[in-house]
Amino acid sequence: MSLGRLRKVELRDIWATEAQDFTPWLAEEDNLNLLGETLGIELELKGQEVSVGPFRADILCMTLADDTNVLIENQLERTDHTHLGQLMAYAAGLHSATIVWVAAKFQEDHRAALDWLNEITQDEFQFFGLEVELWKIGDSPAAPKFNVVSKPNDWLSLIHI
């Protein structure tokens, strides 16, 4: 029996830029559905590059369950303090209850910061950290995979209700 081999694909080989390639791709309905499946949340797009004062948040969605705002901030690199600050400012400016940080790789201190935020905030706020990967088998198209690295403490029990 012959089986294919998984081969990891560099994110920048598919998405050269975050703003012009990755964000529009993620905002497409099928791709938001894939992200939503990973989170256990049904998402509906409200906008891309949404103004927050003089700045722009990557993606704003709402949950279909309760119409609350979901902020999605993307980073096609290793997480950094700048994006952590942007996440907080955009979440406050857009009154987001669910905050999703998608990155190529999470530094441990940034994962710990999201875990801490999940511990200290009220139950209506949820912080997620996801690493995005791309994989191929042979000459197949690249396939995305979202890996949850940080989630609310009660997240698993909430999505099974």
Where are these regions (language model features)?
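Charged, terminal alpha-helix-loop-beta segments
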Residues: 1-159
